[in-house]
Swiss-Prot record:
Assembly information from the UniProt record: Interacts with actin and AIP1 in a ternary complex.
Originating gene: COF1
This protein's name: Cofilin
PTM characteristics: The N-terminus is blocked.
Domain ADF-H: 5-137
Modified positions (Phosphoserine) in chain numbering: 4
InterPro entries reported for this sequence: ADF-H, ADF-H/Gelsolin-like_dom_sf, ADF/Cofilin
Locations listed in the record: Cytoplasm; Cytoplasm, Cytoskeleton; Nucleus matrix
A single GO BP: endocytosis
Length: 143
């Protein structure tokens, strides 16, 4: 349960585990149910295109997302994969929505074991492929 009293629906955890363990999805979009009492799955996708993911982010509302981010380091070490947690809260979203999503984030984030990187986005430049690549690859290759 979060500070806002919002709970994480079981379906949200099931979908996350399907992405993490079964590689069933490329990304999952989460949002609040209509009563604003539970974090539920809004959509899942197997589309490998990062642009397809970005197209799903609403211009005027908040959501959470999990993305199985694949990338290569220096081109010769093979592909790597990191699970990225997004909090999408555009400046144009209603203030109430931003407040509820901000205060409910920790409940979802704590429930999702195995996330390697968190990205907070208020505009599309903050969630661009290059911006996220920079975040997930920090320290990679230096081990």
């Amino acid at each position: 349960m979060s500070r806002s009293g919002v709970a994480v629906a079981d379906e949200s955890l099931t979908a996350f585990n399907d992405l993490k363990l079964g590689k069933k999805y490329k990304f999952i979009l989460f949002g609040l149910n209509d009563a604003k009492t539970e974090i539920v799955v809004k959509e899942t996708s197997t589309d490998p295109s990062y642009d397809a993911f970005l197209e799903k982010l609403p211009e005027n509302d908040c959501l959470y997302a999990i993305y199985d981010f694949e990338y290569e380091i220096n081109g010769n070490e093979g592909k790597r994969s990191k699970i990225v947690f997004f909090t999408w809260s555009p400046d144009t979203a209603p203030v109430r929505s931003k407040m509820v999503y901000a205060s409910s984030k920790d409940a979802l984030r704590r429930a999702l074991n195995g996330v390697s990187t968190d990205v907070q986005g208020t505009d599309f430049s903050e969630v661009s492929y290059d911006s996220v690549l920079e975040r997930v690859s920090r320290g990679a290759g230096s081990h």
